[in-house]
Amino acid sequence: MLSNLSKSLLSKGKFINKNNLLKNKRSFGTIVPGDKFEWNDPLSLESLLTEEEVMIRDQVNKFCQDELMPRIQMAYRDEKFDREIMREYGKMGMLGATIPAYGGVSHVAYGLMANAVEKVDSGYRSAMSVQSSLVMHPINTFGTDAQKSKYLDGLASGDLVGCFGLTEPNAGSDPAGMQTRAVKNSAGNYVLNGTKTWITNSPIADVFVVWAKVENGDIRGFVLEKGMKGLSAPKIEGKLSLRASITGMIVMEDVEVPPTAMFPEVKGLRGPFSCLNKARYGIGWGSLGAAEFCYSTARQYGLDRKQFGKPLAANQLYQKKLADMATEISLGLQACYQVGRLIDAGKATPERISLIKRNSCGKSLDIARQSRDMLGGNGIADEYHVIRHAANLETVNTYEGTHDIHALILGRAITGIPSF
């Protein structure tokens, strides 16, 4: 039936062709018999993707399941990251993929890559996104032609590994409070002193993008190289999260570099924040990949496991939990998709990226915890993987801006009043 509003508009001649409109009742929400609800794609994200995006998603998913999934259980147990994975990413074209010279794929395609990798492990996705968003992006965007020529090809192939140094022991959510200094000496070179911490990839890095305050207080970016005198990157041991990602510090003790090591134009927090927004966007997609794995695992477990003479999935509460998971994942993916399209159209804002980063990470952590509970005692066994995802997501919900910091970013945008 036509709505009263539609009938009113028709009677007033507001539609061009009344007869065609009456025939085309699908315009008014009629369910087409051929349409089908898919438990793993409730809102048909698939229908929004281009052919190229579907192809990229399928190829990367296959690579992740065939090459990464068989290694993750022991990598997590042993707290070991396989350096060769970076070269494998390079061969797949997954590093710096949105940069025109290294693939030029859409941001939705990049998000699908991050999603596929994090279905396996958040640490594996961290290694990829740091290289792409926090190292290649600033060199490509802010670097000189010489810096681009020297580093980008090697980073894109995975022959070089990069890291990004912003967070410090006393400057986490407040990066403007950084204590790392770059002081010009009599020879005209910069001498860097300071410590960065919780740095993904630093112990194996060849290229270090670090941010420091120069003498006038401006924050400037520098590109350092492994082997420079006074530069070290000790590993942080004993993590109970992201164990398959290598994490360390960057220690700079009188590291002397020429002015050509500095990004020439960008000043202040605009530089590092542009990198963080790139990374946060990928995290929005990626964390939902971990949630999808946990949801799928809980669903299958509920269908297979029988208690009291019937599958766990036959219970109302179990189904309600699965319905909640499916709802949050599908809504979250639609939001990530929309922001990806906005980025490609040049219309994304930091607040929109904060919204999806905060929503995806918070909801994914809740889903992983719930999945762990639904598996009962098996939920803590690493062969089921959900406890690993839950532990990882505790970190993903924290880094690149904590859940609460993103709430404050949104609060400032909503009210116009900064609270930090």
Curated annotation (Swiss-Prot):
<keyword id="KW-0274">FAD</keyword>
<dbReference type="InterPro" id="IPR006091">
    <property type="entry name" value="Acyl-CoA_Oxase/DH_mid-dom"/>
</dbReference>
<feature type="binding site">
    <location>
        <begin position="164"/>
        <end position="167"/>
    </location>
    <ligand>
        <name>FAD</name>
    </ligand>
</feature>
<feature type="binding site">
    <location>
        <position position="173"/>
    </location>
    <ligand>
        <name>FAD</name>
    </ligand>
</feature>
<dbReference type="InterPro" id="IPR006089">
    <property type="entry name" value="Acyl-CoA_DH_CS"/>
</dbReference>
<protein>
    <recommendedName>
        <fullName>Glutaryl-CoA dehydrogenase, mitochondrial</fullName>
        <ecNumber>1.3.8.6</ecNumber>
    </recommendedName>
</protein>
<feature type="binding site">
    <location>
        <begin position="198"/>
        <end position="200"/>
    </location>
    <ligand>
        <name>FAD</name>
    </ligand>
</feature>
<dbReference type="GO" id="GO:0004361">
    <property type="term" value="F:glutaryl-CoA dehydrogenase activity"/>
</dbReference>
<comment type="pathway">
    <text>Amino-acid metabolism; lysine degradation.</text>
</comment>
<dbReference type="InterPro" id="IPR036250">
    <property type="entry name" value="AcylCo_DH-like_C"/>
</dbReference>
<keyword id="KW-0560">Oxidoreductase</keyword>
<dbReference type="GO" id="GO:0050660">
    <property type="term" value="F:flavin adenine dinucleotide binding"/>
</dbReference>
<feature type="active site" description="Proton acceptor">
    <location>
        <position position="400"/>
    </location>
</feature>
<feature type="binding site">
    <location>
        <begin position="125"/>
        <end position="126"/>
    </location>
    <ligand>
        <name>substrate</name>
    </ligand>
</feature>
<keyword id="KW-0809">Transit peptide</keyword>
<feature type="binding site">
    <location>
        <begin position="273"/>
        <end position="277"/>
    </location>
    <ligand>
        <name>substrate</name>
    </ligand>
</feature>
<comment type="pathway">
    <text>Amino-acid metabolism; tryptophan metabolism.</text>
</comment>
<dbReference type="GO" id="GO:0006568">
    <property type="term" value="P:L-tryptophan metabolic process"/>
</dbReference>
<dbReference type="Pfam" id="PF00441">
    <property type="entry name" value="Acyl-CoA_dh_1"/>
</dbReference>
<dbReference type="GO" id="GO:0005739">
    <property type="term" value="C:mitochondrion"/>
</dbReference>
<dbReference type="InterPro" id="IPR009075">
    <property type="entry name" value="AcylCo_DH/oxidase_C"/>
</dbReference>
<feature type="binding site">
    <location>
        <position position="420"/>
    </location>
    <ligand>
        <name>FAD</name>
    </ligand>
</feature>
<keyword id="KW-0496">Mitochondrion</keyword>
<feature type="binding site">
    <location>
        <position position="173"/>
    </location>
    <ligand>
        <name>substrate</name>
    </ligand>
</feature>
<comment type="similarity">
    <text>Belongs to the acyl-CoA dehydrogenase family.</text>
</comment>
<dbReference type="GO" id="GO:0005759">
    <property type="term" value="C:mitochondrial matrix"/>
</dbReference>
<feature type="binding site">
    <location>
        <position position="402"/>
    </location>
    <ligand>
        <name>FAD</name>
    </ligand>
</feature>
<dbReference type="InterPro" id="IPR013786">
    <property type="entry name" value="AcylCoA_DH/ox_N"/>
</dbReference>
<dbReference type="InterPro" id="IPR037069">
    <property type="entry name" value="AcylCoA_DH/ox_N_sf"/>
</dbReference>
<dbReference type="InterPro" id="IPR052033">
    <property type="entry name" value="Glutaryl-CoA_DH_mitochondrial"/>
</dbReference>
<dbReference type="GO" id="GO:0046949">
    <property type="term" value="P:fatty-acyl-CoA biosynthetic process"/>
</dbReference>
<dbReference type="GO" id="GO:0000062">
    <property type="term" value="F:fatty-acyl-CoA binding"/>
</dbReference>
<dbReference type="InterPro" id="IPR046373">
    <property type="entry name" value="Acyl-CoA_Oxase/DH_mid-dom_sf"/>
</dbReference>
<dbReference type="GO" id="GO:0033539">
    <property type="term" value="P:fatty acid beta-oxidation using acyl-CoA dehydrogenase"/>
</dbReference>
<feature type="binding site">
    <location>
        <position position="280"/>
    </location>
    <ligand>
        <name>substrate</name>
    </ligand>
</feature>
<dbReference type="InterPro" id="IPR009100">
    <property type="entry name" value="AcylCoA_DH/oxidase_NM_dom_sf"/>
</dbReference>
<keyword id="KW-0285">Flavoprotein</keyword>
<dbReference type="Pfam" id="PF02771">
    <property type="entry name" value="Acyl-CoA_dh_N"/>
</dbReference>
<dbReference type="Pfam" id="PF02770">
    <property type="entry name" value="Acyl-CoA_dh_M"/>
</dbReference>
